[in-house]
Amino acid sequence: MSQSDSQPFDLLLAGGTLIDGSNTPGRRADLGVRGDRIAAIGDLSDAAAHTRVDVSGLVVAPGFIDSHTHDDNYLLRRRDMTPKISQGVTTVVTGNCGISLAPLAHANPPAPLDLLDEGGSYRFERFADYLDALRATPAAVNAACMVGHSTLRAAVMPDLQRAATDEEIAAMRDLAEEAMASGAIGISTGAFYPPAARATTEEIIEVCRPLSAHGGIYATHMRDEGEHIVAALEETFRIGRELDVPVVISHHKVMGQPNFGRSRETLPLIEAAMARQDVSLDAYPYVAGSTMLKQDRVLLAGRTIITWCKPFPELSGRDLDEVAAERGKSKYDVVPELQPAGAIYFMMDEPDVQRILAFGPTMIGSDGLPHDERPHPRLWGTFPRVLGHYARDLGLFPLETAVWKMTGLTAARFGLAGRGQLQAGYFADLVVFDPATVADTATFEHPTERAAGIHSVYVNGAPVWQEQAFTGQHAGRVLARTAA
């Protein structure tokens, strides 16, 4: 045994079941940590440790990686990141749906960029400045950051309701190049949203050219997730092919009652594309989604709940149908007078949700909106809901598969080296949970309830969540992508 091997561990988790993030069966073993790394796995009963924790009867897993967040500003404003660490998340991927906090200096960013804003939040003219701020004031979790196409448009174009000119495309491409060179892991788009709805496929391809040279990811909230979802998928695949870069289909779903069941159509299309090019997807475990309040979404949804409303804050948490009735209007016609606002939309079918979650390559991403006054419960409950409700209670897949979908798979697809698995030499991002009791307790009525069954969470070897509370340690780092 070398001198380094004989040194006491800083942390020793003893007697737990290790589910290592590789989608293989769990095994009983001890895990030792030195500094920010996993130092040893096996029978460590005779080893010395500064801190030894008996985790008998509990699962030790890699910290969960939230593949789809809007935590860009929350990482700076609420550095404890309690909605995430309380459910075992140790890394968040930001800059999704075309929305990133940089590069943009803007006092009043257009919707949906305002989903990240708390007033004065858009102050970083370069992506490097944003990453520098994250490094200067680290959060409790790691962050892997993308740059958003809608943010680039807002930075360059005085009028977003048109296609970009060649000069504007070149300016956006320069900003994208700066972001990628500074450490962005990819570029996201959200052509579903007004700021980018007029962007052509060719514009997106040209703005995203820096991805090819930097080995970055192209992630997309597709142009349509309802009636025209097949055309949207084809556009997404084309962009990936022309740039020769990995594609991530964000929060895959089929929206609106007329489209219920169409995951039987979309998943084979995605699987076929995977055989030809690098395609990934993620999903959240709910039949309701949440974003800005939009008239077209209101028509698709069976029920709509207001999550925030700037002109009428008292409407947060109210049902849109009730508000419309009180004002003597249809729910469609009442939307303009409530702007800007956000909403939860019940518009998916449970069999589709289960089919997408059970699809082998599907990663787990919360898509939570942390600045909403009454957020969708996915912000607090996504990961324990997959582990408890879908894996344990419904038996949709084994616990080991559930863990893989939120750890090893995600780390591999996003190129997060040394993360997502329990291996000696890997970073000590860890979650300890009770497989019998882990569960989401956040509901649409009480959306900020903490998960049950999460014992403790470690980020880069430091404890960040113990005894149902933040420990005060801001151990997170800005993560780079290692291209495959």
UniProtKB/Swiss-Prot annotation:
Keywords (A to Z) from UniProt: Cytoplasm, Hydrolase, Zinc
Q: Pfam families from the entry? A: Amidohydro_3
Q: Does the keyword Zinc apply?
A: yes
**Main location class:** cytoplasm
As cofactor, the record names: Zn(2+)
InterPro entries found in the cross-reference section = Amidohydro_3 (IPR013108), D-aminoacylase_insert_dom_sf (IPR023100), Metal-dep_hydrolase_composite (IPR011059), Metal_Hydrolase (IPR032466), Metallo-dep_Hydrolases_sf (IPR050378)
Enumerate the subcellular locations listed in this protein's record, separating them with semicolons: Cytoplasm
Please state the Enzyme Commission number of this protein.
3.5.1.81
Catalyses which reaction?
A: an N-acyl-D-amino acid + H2O = a D-alpha-amino acid + a carboxylate
Question: What GO CC terms are in its UniProt record?
Answer: cytoplasm
Q: What class of enzyme is it?
A: hydrolase
Which molecular function terms from Gene Ontology are attached?
N-acyl-D-amino-acid deacylase activity
Which domain of life does this protein belong to? Bacteria
Its biological purpose is as follows:
Has a wide specificity; hydrolyzes N-acyl derivative of neutral D-amino acids.
To which protein family does this belong? Belongs to the metallo-dependent hydrolases superfamily. N-acyl-D-amino-acid deacylase family.
PANTHER family found in the cross-reference section: COLLAPSIN RESPONSE MEDIATOR PROTEIN, HYDRANTOINASE/DIHYDROPYRIMIDINASE FAMILY MEMBER
UniProt-recorded name of the protein = D-aminoacylase
